[in-house]
Curated annotation (Swiss-Prot):
EC number annotated for this UniProt entry: 7.1.1.-
Organism the protein comes from: Prochlorococcus marinus (strain MIT 9312)
Its membrane topology: Peripheral membrane protein
UniProt keyword Chaperone, yes or no: no
InterPro entries reported in the protein's UniProt record: NdhM
Protein name according to UniProt: NAD(P)H-quinone oxidoreductase subunit M
PANTHER family, sorted: NAD(P)H-QUINONE OXIDOREDUCTASE SUBUNIT M, CHLOROPLASTIC
Amino acid sequence: MEKMLLKSTTRHVRIFTAEVVDNELQFHPNKLTLDLDPDNEFIWNEDSLNEINKKFNELIKERAGKDLDDYELRKIGSEIEGLIKILLQNGQLSYNPDCRVMNYSMGLPKTNEVL
């Protein structure tokens, strides 16, 4: 069977069955690579990045022994998207005003006027 790189793509999360070698993705059947917020829609701090990475690693461990197929990758991506929304709603993450397009894809920001 031919080696095929699988990927799952949501608006803010891309997951590949690959590893990064010399700045290029190379297929690896037992490794996942996370590309987070490729459009730089959010302003990330170290704590929020650590929380995402921790959740990503937990989700991978939960699936130990399972095939890394499209379905499993989509489930991981969806859970990471959900965590991004929670971080945004809790004020641990904010929209990037210098982003290419401001569309508030995870909902309008909470401000004192809205609360």
